[in-house]
From Swiss-Prot:
One of its GO terms (cellular component) is plasma membrane. The lineage of its organism: Bacteria, Pseudomonadati, Pseudomonadota, Alphaproteobacteria, Rhodobacterales. Coiled coil: none annotated. Its main location: membrane. It comes from Ruegeria sp. (strain TM1040). Keywords: Cell membrane, Membrane, Transmembrane, Transmembrane helix. The keyword Phosphoprotein does not apply. This is UPF0391 membrane protein TM1040_2720. The keyword Cell membrane applies. It is a multi-pass membrane protein. It is found in: Cell membrane. The chain crosses the membrane at residues 4-24, 29-48. Belongs to the UPF0391 family. InterPro entries: DUF1328. NCBIfam families: PRK13682.1-1, PRK13682.1-3, PRK13682.1-4.
């Protein structure tokens, strides 16, 4: 259980560095691009699965 707490602490610290630093705007732009790419991939996978049955 302590290992989970330490893992989440590290994730929170990394998020704080990105959030409070100047990297936030660049990260947000990259996140938006990745969101749309994965959204398109999800829709394509759904269509292929529906076609194959």
């Amino acid at each position: 259980m302590l290992s989970w707490a330490l893992a989440f602490l590290v994730i929170a610290l990394i998020a704080a560095v990105f959030g409070f630093g100047g990297i936030a705007s660049a990260s947000a732009g990259i996140a938006q691009i990745l969101f749309f790419i994965f959204l398109v991939m999800f829709v394509v996978a759904l269509i292929l699965r529906a076609v194959r049955g």
